């Protein structure tokens, strides 16, 4: 809507290639003409897309945490009454404690939702022991972070590995890697599942199917 399909396609390809230097250069060039005007149009488009997503989910109870490109401010300003922002929170579901720690793994892109490993570690510490840990990005396991389309390793949380091995939650749920080499892995005694709804097969995870 703002930059056109050709420019966006180039950005996507550079991201797939992990060519962060050229991607950053291209991104900067897109704001040269009138930075303030372009930024305003971009923000309007971002708000509109959040609103469209929340409108589509209006009949469901939604728990949300930020990902690598998400803004807490925009989420909270656009989310509907059925949405609960649960980052850094623990909720009780039936007999289980479910913890949520959002944010994206830091990259050279420096997207608005990325946080430092130190900040992410503090989120995990705040949660303590839970039965299910929910994050945006996966633990740092090669098979879980490798994208089979680009044949490149994406991002994973090393502090999440430590948390899983120390606290031993029953499940680790995450997304972020869109075409993972493995969508399931066992780390210690914890079952790690990529639950992203992206595989073009209309499948999604029903929590009740795992816990009865």
Describe every region a protein language model picked out.
Residues 130-149:
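Active-site rim beta-loop-alpha module in soluble metabolic enzymes
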Residues 1-93, 165-166, 195:
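Core catalytic region of metal-dependent phosphoesterases/phosphodiesterases
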Residues 2-6, 65-75, 91, 106-109, ...:
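Active-site environment of divalent metal-dependent phosphoester hydrolases
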Residues 74-82, 150-161, 185-199:
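Short, electropositive alpha-helical surface patch
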Residues 62-67, 98, 172, 192:
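Hydrophobic/aromatic residues located in beta-strands of well-ordered beta-sheets
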Residues 1, 130, 157-177:
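Proline-aspartate-enriched helix->loop->beta-strand connector
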Residues 94-132, 150-161:
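Binuclear metal-dependent hydrolase catalytic cores centered on His/Asp/Glu-rich metal-binding motifs
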Residues 90-95, 112, 162-166, 179-212:
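Binuclear metal-dependent phosphoesterase catalytic core
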